[in-house]
């Protein structure tokens, strides 16, 4: 695969990542914890796909992305050992948020997941930035800072619904 194609695919995933982070900030502001969890998962997934594309690897599924992330980044030592486990837990939480109305999703859940996702995305951007594709992640880093700064408050404090 040529560099132009890889740059294009990584950039596409970074655009999706930026949009998820911006949507996350808006959903947190509205107190929509379920949507916030989904945004966090998709931000992590889009960062994963961008990482994989930076090595010329196309993920065919969410599970495939996790497997390839583990093989090419975790086992290689570029990402911490718990990365794939955290991504899997976040996927499970996203499934609950999207499909199980009887499962409560709280501001605390969002706070905990945000911390991990922010660290993961920062690491992914460092790896992509250190690569040879010459891709700028400025928009993602700006959206990441906004996602990190947005206040997460419980129902009575921030309004909205879970």
Question: Each PLM stretch: what is its role?
Answer:
Residues 1-162:
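Terminal alpha-helical segments
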């Amino acid at each position: 695969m040529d560099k132009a194609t890889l740059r294009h695919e990584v950039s596409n995933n970074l655009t999706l990542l930026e949009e998820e982070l911006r949507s996350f900030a808006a959903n947190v502001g509205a107190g929509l914890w379920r949507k916030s969890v989904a945004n966090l998962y998709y931000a992590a997934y889009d960062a994963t796909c961008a990482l994989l594309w930076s090595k010329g690897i196309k993920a065919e599924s969410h599970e495939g992305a996790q497997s390839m992330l583990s093989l090419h980044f975790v086992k290689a030592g570029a990402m911490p050992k718990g990365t794939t486990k955290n991504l899997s837990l976040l996927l499970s939480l996203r499934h609950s948020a999207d499909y199980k109305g009887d499962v409560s999703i709280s501001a605390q859940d969002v706070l905990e997941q945000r911390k991990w996702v922010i660290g993961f995305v920062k690491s992914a951007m460092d790896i992509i930035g250190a690569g040879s594709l010459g891709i700028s992640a400025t928009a993602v880093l700006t959206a990441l800072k906004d996602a990190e700064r947005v206040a997460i408050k419980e129902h009575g404090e921030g309004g909205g619904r879970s």
